[in-house]
Amino acid sequence: MKRNIHIISMIMLLCTAGLSAQEVAVKTNLLADALTSPNIGVEVKLSERFSIEADFHYNPFPAGKDIRWKHWMLRPELRYWTCQPFGGHFFGMHLMYGVYNVGKVKLPFGMLKEIRSSRYEGEFMGAGLTYGYHFILSPHWSIETSVGVGFLHNRHERYRCFHCGEKTGSGNRNFIAPTRAAVSLVYVIK
C-alpha cells in the first residue's frame, strides 16, 4: 500500500519538472472542509488540453467523546479540458486510496446504519470518472465544481466498542458509488 502511494507521488513529481508558475493551481474542497475533512489539492497543466490534479484529505482528530471520523485519502486525477486548463468544462479519470477509523456516525439518507453502533477500521481503493466546470472569478481566483462516480473496493474490521479492541467481524465489499463531490476554492499561481 505504501509502495503504491510512493509510486503515485514519484509520478506526480516527475510531471511537475520544468513548470512555470502559470501552469499550477492550489485548491481546497469547501464541501469536504464543511464535513470535517481538511484537504488540499494541487493541479498542474500538462499540455493545451490536459492537466493532472491530486487532492489529499486528512483528519486525525476525534469527532467527539465516542464518535470516530478519522481518515486520510489521496486521489490523483488526469483531466481533459474542452477549452483550456483552468477554465470551462473538464472530464477526468481518477484513482483513490484511503484509510479510515469511523464509528457512531449518523450519515444522511440512512446510509451505512451499522456504523451508528460499531466502529470500523479499514481501507478503500477505487477508480472513477469525473465531470466538472471551472469558473474564473479573477486572474488568480476561481471556483471549481465537480462530481464523480466509480468503483470502490472496501476492506474493514468491525469493533464493538469505540475504545476497546474487541473485534467482532471483518469483511470486503465492492460497489459503485459517488467518488467525488466538490465545490473548490482555487488559487492559480501566476
Give short role names for the model-derived ranges:
Residues 30-34, 56-62, 80, 95-101, ...:
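Transmembrane beta-strands of outer-membrane beta-barrel pores
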Residues 25-40, 59-70, 85:
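Solvent-exposed loop/turn segments connecting transmembrane beta-strands
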Residues 81, 175-190:
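Outer-membrane beta-barrel "beta-signal"
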Residues 58-71, 99-123, 155-174:
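Flexible, solvent-exposed loop segments that connect beta-strands
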Residues 22, 34-36, 68-74, 87, ...:
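Residues that define the transmembrane beta-barrel architecture of outer-membrane proteins
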Residues 26-28, 42, 54, 76, ...:
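Membrane-embedded beta-strand positions of outer-membrane beta-barrel proteins
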Residues 24, 50-52, 86, 140-143:
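Repeated loop/turn-to-beta-strand initiation elements of outer-membrane beta-barrel proteins
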Residues 47-49, 83-87, 136-138, 190:
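Outer-membrane beta-barrel channels and translocator barrels
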